Amino acid sequence: MRGGAWARLVTALMLLVQGKCQQAQECSPGGHRILQSPYRSVHFDSVYLQYSAVQDLICDHSLSPGWYRFLIFDRPAEMPTKCVEMNHCGTQAPIWLSLSDSEALPLPGEMKKLTACATWQFLFSTEKDCCLFQIPVSVRNCGDFFVYLLQPTQGCMGYCAEAISDVKLHTCGPGETENEGGCVGQLSMAQPPAPPAPPGRPKISVELLGSLVFCRCTFDVSPTNTSVGFLIAWSRLSSQEIKEELRQESTLQAFSLLELDGINLRLGDTIFCSAAVFYLEKPDVQSIAVESQEFFAGIKLKPELDTISEDGKEYQLKIESTIPIVCSEFSELDQGCKISLKLKTIEQGKEHLGLNLALSSCHVDLHQNSCANGICSQAVLYYTAVTDFSRDGDRVTDIIVEPIVNDVFLWDRYAPDSIQIKVKDVPSAYCYSFTDPHIITFDGRVYDNFKTGTFVLYKSMSRDFEIHVRQWNCGSLHYSVSCNCGFVAKEEGDIVTFDMCSGQLHESPSYLFVKNQESSSSNIRITESYLGRKITIWFSSGAFIRADLSEWGMSITLRVPSLDYRSTLGLCGTFDENPENDFHDKNGIKIDHDDNYIAFINEWRLQPGRSMFDKVPASSRFPAKPSYCSCWLGTAMHHLLSHHLDSRSHLEMASGCKGIKHLQFSSLIPDLDITSEYINSEALAGKLSPHVPREENNLNFLLQKNAHPNLSKLDLNLPHPGNKILNPPAYLSDERHTQDQEMRKSLQNRWKRQNVKDFHPVYIFQSLGQGNLEEFSYFFPEDHTEDSQPEFAPSWPTASGLTEFSVLAICQQTLANSSIGRLCLPFLGRTLNHVVDMCVKDVLLKDDVNWAEGGVALLENECERRVLEDGKRNVEENRKTVEGILEVLKCPNLCSGHGECMGWGCVCSPGYSSYDCSHSYGMQML
């Protein structure tokens, strides 16, 4: 057959085929209907529709029987011939066209009867069934497109479609390859199309759909004239900080959802999503993938600072959930929808050093709320470093959250990540004003203040805390020297006056008055040691002032907390670890001229009528201080030393949230809490309740007091303050064992130097008003003496014949060879030498060896301080030394060999008394 005839035959056959197609009614525009919902795309994840737009779900159970053609975004589409995943194509059970190995799609003009399948996966099943349901479908190839004879489904199923190219639906020729239904071989040599513009950076958010939580990845897309799809990938960080892919999908929507199911994606995961754009016509042509910022799914603890100091400052701890709170249907309505968190603190390091960090609460609730700016629920609490008055170095504390117990599977047993807080150790400081007085500043500088009058011992520049002291002439036979006779201490609304300056030397009782200016409760604590020889006033900041009483007056010990570091003025110096600038003026500027210490003392001497002895400062309101908890997840006490040094019971702390102040009050010297004797309801009612001396330290007395004192607990929520008379320490004789009537009678002579009407003791227990306080004012002549430092040059031997060598031997024996001096020598160091030098000077000036014992109290206080500061470290090395120190602090001089050391102190043998059993009945005590 000739070539021309062959060509005419082929043309005729083609026209015949086309004629048959044109004759098929279903191929004509009016012979079929169009299904063009983009949700029918095999790339569309329909989970979102099930929870947010259920009305848009594809359900073909109401589809009218007939011929249909598929379009997606006005582009040709056809039913897929491969199994489609469940929850795609805008429905739960997607329907696809199943072709057996022997089956193929019809050629142009042909029609075939085929089978469609619906995919389904049963609950708790790990495998899907691609052909659980079968539906007969007829397919006609109309040349440029397919049409399908469809019928309604049995349930909420939907017919799927996938986009194809505009290329004719015919078998590709030699050298051509099919791509989404099109022949592209002839384009292989052409310039490849430019990739689409990349999307904007994806953002991950969360949303609650019903009772399920989904992560949503969204991004912006540049406008385009070409149909595009999106390739979205989800990944998370593994425990080894390596990204691992969770899921990848192609979709027509500029978002993707991933369920936070607690199995594949869990709370505590760090999640990423990436997105790329591709052409629907050419899926292999893609933009670069753009990845989101990391998204943390869970609860985070966000501290204001992760390194803080022992300075009393408070810091905010935010607890934030990036995931909405989900509650089960069984949740109690009256409890609300919330997640409850229990917080604990764990101290790092092997040494058992006690509480380091306190929280305002050990329990916090996260309530259900709407999400905003990435936060779905938030709670705030506070943390602060515990001022422990120990040189324990910088320490690290973990704040952990116990695993959550919840009915919702997603939240149950979830434990948010812990955080670490480093606490920098800041020193506390002690100042001593003893006997003459000799003053040892906070930074260790030693000087003498022989002046009389009223002085500013201490003033904080960072808070409302100030102490004034009075010094009177304390009876030297040859020289004019002074001693402390009283103090007034004020911390915010609490004012304490301890005063024996109103009477005569050796005769004046002590007057203790407590006032709170702003509320019915006071934040102080008063303790007594050694049967009244030591009186300590504890303040809520951790500061204390201690008076060691004697017949000539009192020696004063002052401790201030680390929050006053580099913020102090007054006779006690600057507290900045630099003794060179301790002599300063009222502006804190160092005094440099030759007589700097004289000028320094004059700078802090108060004019008559200007001190807190004369007038109580005006009342001020102070903000309420938040309470704090010990959330310490610690162990029970396992060292003897810890039992004595820790300010609170570790067992008590470990039991949960125990209310504490953000500082630790510690005392190694056994004390008795006598706060209620000075701050109680009887004082408010104006009832007389005299303080009974405790010199009668017989066995019955100790048994009544129930032995061992509580060295740890400080109840700072006390009743309204009152005031009382505190008798001076007893210099025991038989006549001291008298009745209350004789003691009260002795009170009548105590205001011998007052310049107002005679004192009546009942006034002390009446109103706390300003007028009453002014009524108690007295004339203090030392405020009106000439402002000059006594100049004298004492020499050896003294008038009574005491030599320097003999006095030094007495001081060495009294102090260095005392039980406290010997046992505490490793802790005291050169302080012992300072105290011995003070002793020698005291005896020289007074020409009286009885003054040698004045330094024992300083050794006791300094020893207690050193052990508290340093004793917690090297516990095993210091164990025996500290045990001995604790014994002599409890029973001074080991009861002088005339008594038995018990839990509270010395129980004296018959015929002996005093706190150390050193006094024999009938012997006048020196």
Swiss-Prot record:
Keyword line: Disulfide bond, Secreted, Signal
Pfam families: D8C_UMOD (PF23283), VWD (PF00094)
Domain VWFD: start-end pairs: 429-612
Protein localization: Secreted
A GO term from the CC aspect: extracellular region
UniProt-listed Gene3D superfamilies: Galactose-binding domain-like
Coiled-coil ranges from the UniProt annotation: none
Location, primary (coarse class): secreted
Cystine residue pairs: 431-572, 474-483
Superkingdom in the source lineage: Eukaryota
Database matches in InterPro entries: Dev_Signal_Modulators, EGF-like_dom, VWF_type-D
Keyword Secreted on entry: yes
Signal recorded as keyword: yes
Segment forming the signal sequence: 1-19
Protein name: von Willebrand factor D and EGF domain-containing protein
Organism this protein belongs to: Mus musculus
